[in-house]
Amino acid sequence: MYTYTVNGTAPCAADQSTVTVNETSSPNAGTDGAITTCSTSAPSNLFTALTGAQAGGTWTAPGGAAHSGTLDPSTDAAGIYVYTLNATAPCVSDQSQVTVTINTPPNAGTDGSVTVCDVGAPTALFGELTGAQAGGTWTAPGGGAFSG
């Protein structure tokens, strides 16, 4: 409590007033973070990507819709998720963000089989797989490299 005093001139007495100061802590939404996950990974808590954040805030998804804070990479979108901690006046609210990257799992295709003659022409094995994405590597029986 702070006291303000004005001295009076005799015969008047001094006069005092007081001011009580109530301090409110400002919110801390933490330091921004990032999560990189696979679309087939288990759900994870966005809060764990923030450093030093206070609990009790709210999450919004990319586009601004409310979000639970539990990222399900099979259904949620990649992008920026915002964590907001509201403040009590005169403090201002604080925000942090988690940048989410969701990768698609690799697809080596569906297993296949082929019968070849031991003296026949070379066979391109990649064509024996169904739905395989390009860019993989082949390994021969015994572990050696193979061009496919």
Roles of regions detected by a PLM:
Residues 1-148:
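Proline- and Ser/Thr-rich low-complexity, intrinsically disordered segments
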